[in-house]
């Protein structure tokens, strides 16, 4: 079929579906109407195609309209409306139903789906917003509120607007993008990797990682027919799919109740339903009022409450990136995600496949709105594998999360009385099949998860914990059958065919005894046995709950559908409510038993006596005397730093979200250079300690602030610290030794954090093991010894997950069936104060470096040193670690930190002491002289490269003798290994042993070796010139300059200073913005984007907008979100901005687009809607701690006090610069001061930054723009994520010492302006 014949082609499918194609050429017309031939990328031009799967609802069975007369839908109207949406998203581009690429000329590549894969993640992310815009365009200004469900028999009732005459609206089931590339030159398939994400046109859409399917077209006139695959077959749905998952149940105690009441600090508690450990502590709610669906809903009115903070984690060999967060949604009730952890283990034979796998996880976590705070990359040597186990053909991952419950753990344990309860399905019942040849089975939508988390959090906060009867807690299996059983508890489910997904009922025949077996098989294969990324929520039926549920889920763009109602009989009953044509006599229902695993829980105790066999016996060839070819010490040491496991992780850390939630007190970057070497992370659960009881806060009622309300310091805050440990190079050979080393690494890393006692630490164990004969006994014995090891160390132990790397009962799994053994320890503990922590950057000159190993032995087996030496077989044996000594060592480190005897510290692991000291010197920008103790026997390289777990501490010279004396009194093994130097231009790294010099080189050379792998990975990013952008301008010590002395004001919210905070679809709850507004004294009101017209009244003085980059293409997401907000509230934002007594503040590219489209008055010669945010030159998401200069002449009222100041601030996003139709327009904004803030160099004398990454876009370094009168301000740097000083990764030198974050002054100046302009 050629392109012209598709102009009116609406291919009808089952259920009245049709796939409609649209084309967007990205070139200007050349001579004769032909595309111009350019020098870009093999002289390519690109045409973006859209394949839209519409459901016109004219036929079909089992849909929501079954049994009713369906209104006719005009496909032409839907097509024209969708083209209007594309013109809004892509202004200035031609949009049509016909391809403009020439037929029969040149050669083509296309990324069109061929049926082996499914639509990319971006396709699923934008479909809900496009559906909302489609409804608005077709219905015009008609406001229609349809009820979520309408089953009067179950207490649902009829909602407003039900039964009214409405315009029929087709449903957008999926939107798929494809590129067609045309060239006069010959292009081949192997160019696809280079071309996929390197298209320069602004209409080009960023790919989802793994979406590389460019193929040549045989006939240039043939356009690809997109095939939409939705749940074609069940995957991994066998009831015995993961028989090892039950093992953690053996190591949990279920006889302890959850403690309640008011306590100071936190208390370690145990969940009575699943035995997991957590910390009961005070949590903070930034706002208690939410305006949704034309009504203000309030919770208990208290800014804080008690909840449980806990951690989950799991190792996956084939599941999607965010599978853990779906399956663990109800572990301690419903929990918010405070921080994410990411670890990847793979082979070094194909680094680009490993990078592709890693990028998919980075994108999914970034789009979820939760910061990624910890992680690791373990690159294995494929030539050295344990006996009986081949090298892993594909990488596997560890995903962890720190969560905070907002309700107590719940399960439906008794029948429901009154109006009953209903089960709702959150998310899209969608399963993407594995792409042929792909690196992983599926890719999750982070945006969809963000909408689910934000919607449920808001619903529970507003409706109350009693509104939720139960949450899905399906830990062992992810099938819909298991999730329904978990959501229903002791009760059953009654549902109807009209409530099930179309895919589940499209092939059902009429219900009759003869068809019962076939229908049951269809429902099992297409629904009950399908693993779909959805969450089930059981809600008590009340009119208020239904109203809140409908409004909240529409606000956050979360798809929700009624799945059924609770019934007394514990079974699933499906009623056929289709048209009478399907009635053939007999019962019109089918019954299914509730899900019961085919294996008993808990497992039999006999497995505890099973023998345990180490995988690698201590005999030849693993104890071979051949130590490998000799190598120069210098090359070996630098080679260790170049190893992917040890080397710099900038290619990961600088391209994930690290702070958007505003609750992060420690992320991966530390020191003045923001180097990714942190040993632990920390999230804050109570960002403000509140005023002392003896002081009266100010309420902003008087012009002058009382003197006793001025404070020049910030209070300590409480939170939760986390640390990871893994030794997957050793674990496959010696599981017990590898597990103990991983536990030791996590505990010692956490000892550097500001925790109070080692007894507060809880270690979570995650395990993957091949399900072979005797596996249960081996795993049980291993976990028993790990738990005993933790008890000896004085820490608690949680076994969170145990997964089979090869599943039984279903043949080889899609991920290849590799026999993988993997182990990760994740330690966490409550901290009463986020200050007084030890970070790996050296702080002082002439300090002493002490090395405290966890064992006197030297570990070399499977070390990075042996891998660098090129040994084909690992030699030696693992080091033996005592649990009791580990606990004693951790307590000693805590004592040295508490007494201020140590000022910095770093854990010793991969790469040994040498790698740890090199990272400390680079992070602190200091010279370092390392002294190998002369009294040690053997090769000094063995001491420097030993990977025995331990800690390296920096102790001031004045405190060195006291520290050493204390360690000796506690019988702690301690080595004095070095002395720090000064910060000089030529920093040196020197290693000696007596008179022998082992290494002497400049630190620049050391840093170059350490960054080499990261630079290599950055080169293969989505930009041709990526290799030309280095980190040089970023890795300079920054200085600040203040125009005033920073302070904070002890205040309480003033109800007359009310600010509306916009809630946007697909975005997480704006915690950072609400925290900053409430702490600074504003009365913050969270407002749905559907209800702005009812909120922006005279009682509201300000509007705050904060969005996140929640899709793989920020430009598309920003344009769609802005179009949706303004179409739902026509003229509302423009009228609010035009009032003289209001202000607005926007943070991020999405907020800029919304306010710009609201006609923010910028300049008579430049309309705000003509200003656009431009992408970073890296074409990647950037997370940077950058210097920002406040224009001395800016009229911005928010920057009145900060004018002329140079301050560091977080800047995150893909679009971190501004563009205009002509460069002169922005130049005039800079001259007039409307360029309120600018990206700057390392100090004031450096001037505006012009090079990446200090200026991410390498254009005019404008970071903020204000209106002519200064009332409205949009920023690309996040002042809410820098509002507290504990959010700063490093406090720079300044002309005025910084003890309070100066960014608080932005909100204080806005208060002063509101007071001066109030009526």
Swiss-Prot record:
Signal peptide: none annotated. GO terms for biological process: purine nucleotide biosynthetic process. Gene3D superfamilies: 3.40.50.880, PurM-like C-terminal domain (3.90.650.10), PurM-like, N-terminal domain (3.30.1330.10). One of its GO terms (molecular function) is phosphoribosylformylglycinamidine synthase activity. It is found in: Virion tegument. One of its GO terms (cellular component) is viral tegument. Its main location: virion. It comes from Equine herpesvirus 2 (strain 86/87). Pfam families: AIRS_C (PF02769), FGAR-AT_PurM_N-like (PF22689), GATase_5 (PF13507), Tegument_dsDNA (PF12818). SUPFAM superfamilies: Class I glutamine amidotransferase-like (SSF52317), PurM C-terminal domain-like (SSF56042), PurM N-terminal domain-like (SSF55326). This is Probable membrane antigen 3. It comes from the Viruses. The keyword Disulfide bond does not apply. The gene is 3. Keywords: Virion, Virion tegument.
